[in-house]
Amino acid sequence: MAKSYLSDYIQHCMSFYIRYRNPVFNTKVDELNWNACNNALSNMSVYTKDLICELYKDASRDNVIRLAAENNMSEFDMWKLLRAIEKRIAKERGLI
């Protein structure tokens, strides 16, 4: 199944968030995107945050399978986590 525009947008937001932990924002949109990611992840455990960041470094199917195996999770649960955080960030950003 093809990725939705929303998934691509959240991937872009998370890539920026992961790359710049203490960012200097060039635009208001960059700031809104970074803050949405930060707020969505703020009340999660360090383990879950790290796992999500590792997922978004390379959200390919192979990476999802690898991380699921390394963390004793099913591939289904890993995809479920990815969809849940995507929805959470989209809500924080006001996209849905």
Predicted regions and their residues:
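DNA major-groove recognition helices of helix-turn-helix
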Residues: M78-E92
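N-terminal interaction/assembly modules
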Residues: M1-N43, R66, E70-N71, R93-I96
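Short amphipathic alpha-helical segments
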Residues: L32, V46-D50, K80
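Helix-turn-helix DNA-binding module
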Residues: D58-S74
